[in-house]
Amino acid sequence: MKKNFKKRVFFSILLLLAMYIANIFISTGFFRRIENTFDGSILQEIKIAGAEDITISQTDHFAIVSATARKKIPTTQQENGGLYYIDLTDTNYQPIVLTKNFEKPFAPHGISIFKKDSSYTVAAINHTKEGEFIEIFELIGRELTHQKTLKNERIFSPNDLVLLDENRFYFTNDHKYKEGILHLAEDYLGLAVSNVVYFDGKNYSEVADGIAYANGINYDVKRKLLFVASPRDFLVKVYQKNEDHTLTFIENIDCKTGVDNIEFDTENTLWIGAHPSLLDFSAYAKGDRAIAPSEIIKINYIEKGEYSIEQMYMEDGTTMAAATVAAPYGNLILAGNVMDAQFLILKSNKLLSKKLPFLEKKMKPHHENNILYLLDGKEIAPEDLNEIPPAEIKSVAVFKGAKEVSKYTDKKYDGVILIEIKKEN
């Protein structure tokens, strides 16, 4: 009798253990089929190592890249990185180092920018051996000046942040436990104990918790919606921002992939770099695998219960391992990753956003007589832009400089900016 009881207990434990192991494999996408898919091409490789986060100013046409030369995660040594500026109207896409005069240890992770008047506030997560910090900079033109370093016990395991203005922001902590069995439980069992913290310029307060590996975060100003990536649960969590900056949970979006950083296009569609297999990513991050698969998705979020998810890119990691961010611009996608020696500028055959004003608003005030619009290869007057039905637009491209523009038109003069529009056939 006792022997039978012990056997039942033993087999029950084995069954529970098998269920736990199976859950780990299933919930992390281990069995997911990876198929190389992208309707487009690689426009350029930008030689910046570990370009983990990228954000774009759609109005001023530049990208800020946060990069750290990682060898494996976690690291035992101080890593080195920087912030970079890329002019998106210059088709050479030459990165400019912004932080070469920043003398503190600097291994940036998530970043955010906020424009006020003619300057930008740039905030960056900074991982150092002395602790976790948030660095605040001011960007004027292409000159970045460090303003202050923020340190607090609530900045515990910071991953990403989003600025509301030059002083206030939300940020994510991706873990509650730094090490030990509970840290492993967060990674492998999906223990949901990470959080979102709000900083009002003076005080820190937790505004959301119970998240499995809180990662990328972004804020839709018009709708007052905060989006938080939970890659361990394959979710994007949606919150309503209240007047007092507390958050009200709305719903989870099941993305079926390990969502990472969140960016917006001009129509506030979410663009997300993602890890379709978290176990493969974990092995890659630790140095046990040479590559890990990459995925890019976009989410058109309308309201609670009404949204669509579209896969834009997937591959096995041979071209780009472990994609973390997908920042859209026109029909380009700036796709960053964890540890590759370069990030990719992808050119989609699809128009990513069908709004044209973001181009005209930037160019026209500063180049009143130096803008050329081409519609299907023929010059078009600016006032005729509004006559083009958005649904008929296939692509929009921006070219700057006499050399580039001469490929498309006989008008060859310095300072010209050409906006080429192609319609659906």
Language-model segments: residues:
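Beta-strand-rich domains and repeat architectures in extracellular enzymes and scaffolds
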Residues: 43-81, 339
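Conserved blade-ending motifs and adjacent loop-strand segments that build the rim/top face
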Residues: 43-47, 52, 251-263, 304-329
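Surface loop/turn motifs at the tips and blade-to-blade linkers of beta-strand repeat domains
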Residues: 44-48, 97-104, 149-154, 206-212, ...
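Short, conserved, GDST-rich strand-edge loop motifs in beta-rich repeat architectures
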Residues: 65-79, 125, 171-191, 272-293, ...
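Blade-loop segments of beta-propeller domains
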Residues: 70, 78-125
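Asp-box/WD-like beta-propeller blade repeats and closely related beta-sheet repeat scaffolds
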Residues: 103-110, 114-165, 172-179
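Loop/turn-rich, solvent-exposed surfaces of beta-rich toroidal or solenoidal domains
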Residues: 256-312
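Short, small/polar-rich motifs associated with maturation and membrane association
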Residues: 355-425
